[in-house]
Amino acid sequence: MTNYAIVKASGRQLWFEPGKYYNINYVHANPGDKIIFYKVLLLKNTNSLLIGKPFVEKVEVHATILQHLKDKKITVFKMQAKKGTKKKKGYKTVLTKIKINCIHNHKK
């Protein structure tokens, strides 16, 4: 059984496992910086399951920022029928690649 945590980060609920890499919405920090997620909604260890109300207390997820990157381009096309108006726009979402170092449970 693997350890994992469900964390509220960058406006979403994300499933984190130690030692894995994830792309999340942009975090204002430099590559190489360490970040800590405190808003843990659920923690699963080998022998226990902790569910928060709404967050699990004294649990934190430690991660390292590896790099900032852009996602694939999303194209938005607007058109008004019978008017001849067309607009084509596109954007690339800026993401941050992180590595989950460990999940600390200070409740033990």
From Swiss-Prot:
Record-level GO BP terms: translation
Gene: rpl21
Subcellular location, record wording: Plastid, Chloroplast
Subunit structure, as described in the record: Part of the 50S ribosomal subunit.
Manganese as UniProt keyword: no
Main subcellular localisation: plastid
Protein name per the record: Large ribosomal subunit protein bL21c
PROSITE patterns the UniProt entry points to: RIBOSOMAL_L21
Keyword rRNA-binding among record annotations: yes
Transmembrane segments: none
Single GO MF descriptor: structural constituent of ribosome
Protein function: This protein binds to 23S rRNA.
InterPro entries for this protein: bL21-like (IPR028909), bL21-like_sf (IPR036164), Ribosomal_bL21 (IPR001787), Ribosomal_bL21_CS (IPR018258)
Family listed: Belongs to the bacterial ribosomal protein bL21 family.
UniProt KW keywords: Chloroplast, Plastid, Ribonucleoprotein, Ribosomal protein, RNA-binding, rRNA-binding
GO cellular component: chloroplast; mitochondrial large ribosomal subunit
